[in-house]
Amino acid sequence: MKRAIGIAISTALLAMGAAGATAQGAPASAEPAQLVESGHIVVDGRQTAYVIHRLPTDSFPQLPEQVAAVLNERGCMVPQTYEAHRPENVIHASLERAGSSDWAALCSAKGTVSLMVFFGTALETPMVLATAPETERLQPHDPSGVLGFNWGIDRASPEQVHEAQAGMDQRPAPPGHDALADSRIEHRTIYHFYTKGAWTLLEMPDQ
């Protein structure tokens, strides 16, 4: 966010979900435990409340064991946007080349969020494409003024990339494999694309 943001004192981690299941007599493991962090940051000189929801890696059973192990070793939780209705910010796509089986995830650990990519050819050695303090990925989203997490990632197929490039004076042909869509809600989406052994940002029309 472009506004100056500073971290205030109060931050609390509250375990959710498991307590509700236990209260009804169900095993605590019946639902994945969702962590909720609440606190305050300074926005434009005023204390502003925020809430961040995160999920553990076992909320994503499709993750390969090697990927989950790396995320767990780094103490990662997966932050969820304030729009989330199901587990998000873990994707499976062909990011290295056409037909490859690759993964990407947002990792929240020690107050920092990192965008990590795991190629199928090297699942235990992820690449980090971007990092940011978690409190710099917050924005208001309802009349209460409480801030929520706004960073999301998605698979972008060649067709979706080509559609996003509509309106360019010299519109490129669709790329040869998936890109990684990197978005902040209500902001511009950027597209990471791996080609010739390096990551690049795909050109998009002015927004």
Task: Locate the predicted segments by residue.
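Structural motif
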Residues: 111-117, 188-191
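Bacterial N-terminal signal peptides that target proteins for export
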Residues: 1-9
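Acidic, small-residue rich beta-repeat scaffolds with periodic aromatic anchors
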Residues: 5, 17-58, 134-207
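Extracellular C-terminal loop/segment signatures of secreted glycoproteins
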Residues: 117-134
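Short secondary-structure junctions
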Residues: 75-81, 125-128, 199-203
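Primarily extracytoplasmic ectodomains and periplasmic/lumenal surface modules that are beta-strand-rich
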Residues: 99-101, 110-113, 124
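Short N-terminal edge-element motif at the start of the domain
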Residues: 62-97
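Acidic/hydrophobic-patterned starts of short beta strands in beta-sheet-rich repeat architectures
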Residues: 94-107, 173-181
